[in-house]
């Protein structure tokens, strides 16, 4: 599932939970989607951090 659709579905389930409640299946789906979203974000942060290169203090420009 692409990120936009994932977020849309998470938001839909959140709004539905506040307005009328969720079925047990929807609650399970909501938790699964939230976990998938968090895992994607963690992966993106990890990739970004792995690409960071430390510059020695002597080579920095102020």
From Swiss-Prot:
Domain of life: Bacteria
One Pfam family matching this protein: DUF896
Organism: Clostridium botulinum (strain Langeland / NCTC 10281 / Type F)
Intracellular or extracellular location(s): Cytoplasm
Keyword Ubl conjugation: no
Keyword Cytoplasm: yes
Predominant cellular place of this UniProt entry's protein: cytoplasm
Gene Ontology CC terms: cytoplasm
InterPro entries: DUF896
Protein name (Swiss-Prot/TrEMBL): UPF0291 protein CLI_2672
Entry similarity comment: Belongs to the UPF0291 family.
Swiss-Prot/TrEMBL keywords: Cytoplasm
């Amino acid at each position: 599932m692409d990120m936009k659709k994932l977020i849309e579905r998470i938001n839909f389930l959140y709004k539905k939970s506040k307005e009328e409640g969720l079925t047990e299946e929807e609650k399970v789906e909501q938790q699964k989607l939230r976990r998938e979203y968090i895992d994607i974000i963690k992966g993106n942060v990890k990739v970004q951090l792995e690409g960071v290169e430390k510059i020695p203090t002597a080579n920095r420009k102020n």
